[in-house]
Amino acid sequence: VGSEMCIRDSLNNYVNLYPGAVTPQQWGGVTIFPFGAGAGFHGIPGDVTPPSRFVRVAFYKATAPVCPTAYDAILQSFHILNNFDIPIGIEHALGKAPDIPSATQWTSAIDLTNRKVYYKTAYNNNIRCISMKKIDFDKVKYQSYPLDKELKQPIEEIIVK
């Protein structure tokens, strides 16, 4: 009961938020318009604290479309999770960041039905997949691999002719 109350109380602070557009309003004979699409979410917290990230993910998840395929659901998951990457240095005073960054080091999503784990890292935003179906857990002993072969984001150059 306590955690449910905490969740509800956190979200109650944002009862004024809703998905979609805000309708223009008349104020003293002047029509005022929203700044852009999605203005119904104006006021959603944007800082990197856990409570603010929780509120954002709750609203993003609640308004996400139902995906027709597992592939679409994984891509939608990463679109939502992209909003929660914490850049290196933002959590510390200027010049005080530790050697081990507390920034987002990897992001993952899991397809439980197809037994696949997807991930991307701070060094490579390409989504990678590990199929658990292809691993014979009776034969394979514990192993570990680096998440990245190289700590460098590949960039594809587009040549315009």
What are the language-model segments listed below?
Residues 2-6:
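Short, small-residue-biased leader/transition segments that mark boundaries at the very start
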Residues 8-161:
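C-terminus-biased signal that marks the final domain/tail of proteins
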